[in-house]
């Protein structure tokens, strides 16, 4: 993991280096230290704003050549709107906008972390720093040719000029670990499937041991002994053996029940015998976005030494067509003892989750479980790419996830569960079938999963629209978004860490 930029903090009075970024409100008013740094150039900024019809709208940017007397190569003015009532996500966006103004050859940038009424708080400045790193991320390790101006590979040095350097550094030490977790998740989602198969994914998850995370890897023999027939059935058509990885971070009170996060890790999904169309099948390398999030989250929590007991569990398989592959009509027995008729082998993620959820519920007795999965195309039809679908058997957990989604910017939207949907997954030959047809596809998938939580408070996040291939944003220009790491870190920090 490496960054294209290096972020540091300096006093507001420090001399600018490279590109200078400042903030204004919708009246083009600057902060006192900013106005002092620009000197007589403030009038030139106003004239440039008028010529460009720049109104200081939140997130808008005015890019001009640095005026004479300003020690910078370029001057960028970012609008902060009314500059009151701003949230952490606004500052995250400001950082992304600033990073977007870095050219491939830019060596340095100085950002005046000041609003018209004075210096930003340390938390606001740190949110800008996080936005810078998230926007600057790129996955180009397999490119052998660079575009013009990209040669050299040197990192841009970005300085945030702040009111309290020590406080900003301390706050960023923690927030930076969360950004690292997002980057890890993005890397995993972006990797090609010939590189990131179940065994390799398990190896990378095992690297968390360096941070003090306990990691247990279950191989096929161990899973077979446990009776995980639902998960194993999905992977039996692949030459790559399946794995389940259990990660434990014990940062809370000894003996206290953990909170648990479970990720679907289908490293490549052809659909199996119910094979997918060829168009865009390459995107199915990202069908492990839930597992990627869980690994990134466990990194973030361990690196920042979260004061909570946390379990992360991921089921890793490849869903391939083969003479040994699972067939429509097969009946498998899950770890819970419940039997499942396979109607469509492309409804495989819920089979993986069924066994991992049951394992976690029975073996770790968590306070709650949250699973994440790129589970259904139906959720993308329903919610697009702005929200993940959320289903839950516990209102308190659901409300906390909704709030964490708003605060982190990784939004969720609750959809219903109910016994009236059960008949859609009734089977003539087994306890249930693995798909309920076209109607309410995301709901019936969640209804299926609910049968494997053993009464544990639980939420299911369908992240098919948010984990991969979503439109680019101010803080993400990557195909893999790393969705869920910031959301769940916020959930843990707000409600489940000992004070």
UniProtKB/Swiss-Prot annotation:
Family matches, as InterPro entries: Leucine_aapep/pepB, Macro_dom-like, Peptidase_M17_C, Peptidase_M17_leu_NH2_pept, Peptidase_M17_N
Provide the alphabetized UniProt keywords.
Aminopeptidase, Cytoplasm, Hydrolase, Manganese, Metal-binding, Protease
Q: Where does Mn(2+) 2 bind?
A: 264, 269, 287, 348
**Cellular location of this protein?**
Cytoplasm
Task: Tell me where it mainly resides.
Answer: cytoplasm
Cystine links in this protein are: none
Enumerate the GO terms in the molecular function aspect.
Answer: aminopeptidase activity; manganese ion binding; metalloaminopeptidase activity
A Pfam family assignment = Peptidase_M17
**Keyword Hydrolase, does the record have it?**
yes
Q: What class does this enzyme belong to in the EC scheme? A: hydrolase
Q: Which GO terms describe its biological process?
A: proteolysis
Summarizing the function annotation, the protein's role is:
Presumably involved in the processing and regular turnover of intracellular proteins. Catalyzes the removal of unsubstituted N-terminal amino acids from various peptides.
Homology family? Belongs to the peptidase M17 family.
Q: Which PANTHER family match?
A: CYTOSOL AMINOPEPTIDASE, LEUCINE AMINOPEPTIDASE-RELATED
The entry's protein name is: Probable cytosol aminopeptidase
Please name the source species. Bradyrhizobium diazoefficiens (strain JCM 10833 / BCRC 13528 / IAM 13628 / NBRC 14792 / USDA 110)
């Amino acid at each position: 993991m490496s960054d294209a930029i290096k972020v540091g903090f300096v006093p507001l009075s420090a001399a600018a280096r490279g590109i200078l970024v400042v903030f204004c409100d919708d009246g083009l008013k600057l902060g006192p230290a900013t106005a002092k740094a620009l000197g007589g150039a403030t009038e030139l900024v106003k004239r440039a704003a008028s010529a460009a019809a720049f109104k200081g709208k939140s997130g808008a940017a005015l890019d001009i050549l640095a005026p004479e007397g300003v020690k910078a190569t370029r001057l960028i003015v970012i609008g902060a709107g009314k500059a009151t009532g701003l949230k952490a996500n606004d500052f995250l966006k400001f950082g992304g906008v600033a990073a977007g103004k870095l050219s491939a050859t830019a060596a340095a940038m100085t950002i005046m972390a000041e609003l018209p009424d004075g210096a930003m708080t340390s938390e606001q400045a740190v949110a800008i720093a996080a936005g810078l790193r998230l926007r600057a991320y790129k996955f180009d390790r397999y490119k052998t040719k660079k575009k013009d101006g990209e040669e050299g590979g040197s990192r841009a040095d970005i300085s945030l000029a702040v009111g309290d350097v020590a406080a900003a550094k301390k706050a960023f030490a923690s927030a930076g670990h969360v950004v690292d977790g997002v980057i890890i998740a993005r890397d995993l989602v972006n990797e090609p499937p010939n590189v990131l198969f179940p065994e390799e994914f398990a190896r990378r998850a095992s690297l968390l041991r360096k941070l003090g995370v306990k990691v247990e890897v279950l191989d096929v023999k161990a899973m077979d002994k446990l009776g995980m027939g639902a998960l194993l059935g999905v992977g039996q058509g692949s030459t790559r053996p399946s794995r389940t990885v259990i990660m434990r971070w014990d940062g809370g009170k000894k003996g206290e029940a953990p909170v648990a996060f479970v990720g679907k890790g289908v490293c490549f999904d052809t659909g199996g015998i119910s094979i997918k169309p060829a168009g865009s099948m390459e995107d199915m390398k990202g069908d492990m976005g839930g597992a990627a999030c869980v690994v990134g989250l466990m990194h973030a929590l361990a690196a920042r030494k979260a004061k909570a007991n946390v379990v992360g569990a991921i089921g890793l398989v490849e869903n391939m067509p083969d003479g040994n592959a699972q067939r429509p009509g097969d009946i498998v027995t899950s770890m819970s003892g419940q039997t499942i008729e396979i109607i469509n082998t492309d409804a495989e993620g819920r089979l993986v989750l069924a066994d991992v959820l049951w394992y976690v519920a029975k073996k770790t007795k968590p306070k709650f479980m949250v699973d994440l999965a790129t589970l259904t195309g139906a959720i993308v039809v329903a919610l697009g790419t702005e929200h993940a679908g959320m289903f839950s058997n516990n209102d308190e957990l659901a409300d906390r996830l909704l709030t964490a989604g708003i605060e982190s910017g990784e939004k969720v939207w609750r959809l219903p569960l109910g016994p009236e949907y059960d008949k859609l997954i009734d089977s003539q030959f087994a306890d249930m079938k693995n798909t309920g047809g076209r109607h309410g596809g995301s709901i019936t998938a969640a209804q299926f999963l609910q049968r494997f939580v053993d009464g544990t408070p639980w939420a299911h996040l369908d992240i098919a629209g948010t984990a991969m291939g979503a439109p680019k944003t101010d803080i993400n220009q990557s195909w893999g978004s790393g969705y869920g790491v910031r959301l769940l870190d916020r959930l843990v920090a707000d409600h489940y860490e000992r004070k």
